[in-house]
Design a protein with these regions (language model features):
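Beta1/beta-strand and adjacent pyrophosphate-binding region of the FAD-binding site
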Residues: 2-15
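Short hydrophobic core segments
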Residues: 8-10, 37, 159-175, 187-188, ...
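Glycine-rich FAD pyrophosphate-binding loop
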Residues: 24-52
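An anion/pyrophosphate-binding glycine-rich loop and adjacent beta-alpha core
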Residues: 41-43, 48-49, 99, 194-199, ...
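Glycine-rich active-site loop/strand segments that organize a redox cofactor
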Residues: 52-102
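A glycine-rich dinucleotide-binding beta-alpha-beta segment and adjacent secondary-structure elements
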Residues: 135, 311-396
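A conserved short coil-to-beta-strand element within the FAD-binding core of flavoproteins
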Residues: 135-148
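A conserved FAD-binding loop/helix module that cradles the flavin
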Residues: 173-186, 395-422
Length: 437
């Protein structure tokens, strides 16, 4: 026997939960008639993971400046961001007893630094607004009904009818969290929804012959990374860089990952904004000295980790980086070339090896084409009553809270539109389905 609801939200992540937290169905019925279908046994998994569990939920500063963080799609979603901006979400949390603060260049966190606090708030407000949460319900089919409305069917055999559906199923990054991209296939098959081919973004950059495994863990506060290829516009990223055992990570690498294709060239300036000429001059002075350790001098003059300086000097001599050499205590300058070392420090070049694994990507580029939606409401133009929010859409931002901000902005715009639609269109057309047959 089909259950019938005013609104079904498919996906219990950040976007889906904020939609429910801001859509008050009890205004129409004391018990409310909303349903959240979560594919996994644990809603809000990615929200709990954000900011290493501390919940980097947005970025501070002017919303005007935020638009650029979304690349080519920034202009298209500008109105969505303005309708519910970063200050609005900060105020929302504050009103509900979750104060926040800014750190790391503008990243916003709850003062408790606990993502679970934000998740609990969204879950509680969803229930207050008349939504029930069903866990372990993965939608496998969406069908338009002859008398308007939709029916959704799940893998476990359950089926529900509703007047409105909100697609909040996320992208494909971290598929173990439930967002594996399967809902795109369902929408494309059942409703002919256009889906832009997805690719992983906000992930480490893997290169051929990566040399820094022995010094993994070293980081740089300000490095410049750029991607070049024949006939391709140069893409640049400046920020923190982390050397891991297998690849380049940290914000600078994560933010340029989306521009990198296998075979492209990755250029790294570890001492940005210093130029090769400036660094060559510094090195000439160091290497011409008769006393002292050039590694110590290099680390001090350029504010670099000592172990990294040893590694660079070894590479300039054509030697592999291994633990014994890296921790060797003394050096001489025989064979060291200021120009060779400067080239490695200011323009270290590598060939991009492959696209990142979905299990390492923090976000998705691609998804439901924005052209399918009326971005004033987040409703599909060709499918009245069907909405989409968050990472399920073809929108991705740089690291720093921007992707969660779009999730919250789009969810709020959607909730506002649905609040009006349920009050007017659905009731006028007799589509309120808050009973059981």
């Amino acid at each position: 026997m089909d259950k019938k609801y005013d609104c079904i939200i498919i996906g219990g992540g950040a976007a889906g939960l904020l939609t429910a937290a801001r859509l008050d169905l009890t205004a129409f019925s004391p018990k409310g008639t909303g349903l959240i279908l979560e594919a996994t046994d644990s809603p809000g998994t990615k929200l709990r993971m954000s900011g290493a569990g501390h919940c980097n939920f947005t970025h501070d500063g002017s919303v005007k400046d935020m638009v650029a963080a979304y690349g080519e799609q920034g202009r298209a979603i500008r109105r969505v961001l303005y309708r519910y901006n970063n200050d609005a979400f900060v105020d929302f949390l504050d009103r509900h007893g979750i104060p926040s603060f800014s750190r790391d260049g503008g990243r916003m966190f709850p003062k408790s630094q606990k993502a679970q606090d934000v998740l609990n708030l969204l879950l509680d407000l969803s229930v207050e607004n008349g939504f029930a949460l069903k866990k372990g319900f993965r939608v496998s089919q969406v069908t338009r009904l002859p008398d308007a409305g939709c029916q959704v069917a799940c893998d476990n055999g359950a089926a529900f009818r509703t007047a409105a559906i909100v697609i909040a199923t996320g992208g494909k990054s971290f598929p173990a969290t439930g967002s594996n991209g399967r809902m795109w296939d369902v929408l494309s098959r059942d409703l002919d929804v256009e889906v832009i081919s997805p690719r992983p973004v906000l992930a480490p950059v893997a290169v051929r012959s990566y040399p820094y495994g022995p010094v993994a863990g070293l980081s740089f506060e300000t490095a410049e990374l750029s991607i070049t290829a024949p006939g391709k516009k140069i893409q640049r990223s400046v920020g923190d860089l982390l050397l891991t055992h297998r690849d380049f990570s940290g914000p600078a690498a994560l933010n340029i990952c989306g521009a990198a294709e296998p075979g492209d060239t990755l250029h790294i300036n570890y001492v940005y904004p210093r130029s090769r000429e400036e660094v060559t001059e510094i090195l000439s002075g160091i290497f011409s000295g008769k006393k002292g350790n050039p590694v110590s001098a290099l680390a001090s003059r350029l504010n670099l980790p000592r172990r990294f300086c040893q590694s660079i000097l070894l590479r300039s001599l054509g030697k592999p980086i291994d633990a014994e050499d890296v921790f060797r205590g003394s050096w001489n300058v025989d064979g060291l070339s200021p120009k060779k070392v400067s080239a490695l420090l200011c323009d270290d070049t590598f060939t991009v090896e492959s696209l990142p694994d979905w299990n390492k990507a923090m976000a998705t580029r691609g998804g439901i084409a924005l052209s399918q939606l009326d971005l004033r409401t987040m409703e599909f133009r060709e499918h009245p009553g069907l909405f989409a929010v968050g990472e399920a859409l073809d929108v991705d931002g740089i690291t720093g809270g921007y992707n969660l901000q779009f999730a919250f902005s789009s969810a709020s715009v959607c909730a506002e539109a649905l609040q009006k639609k349920i009050r007017t269109d659905f009731r006028a057309e007799g589509l309120r389905l808050s009973t059981e047959e």
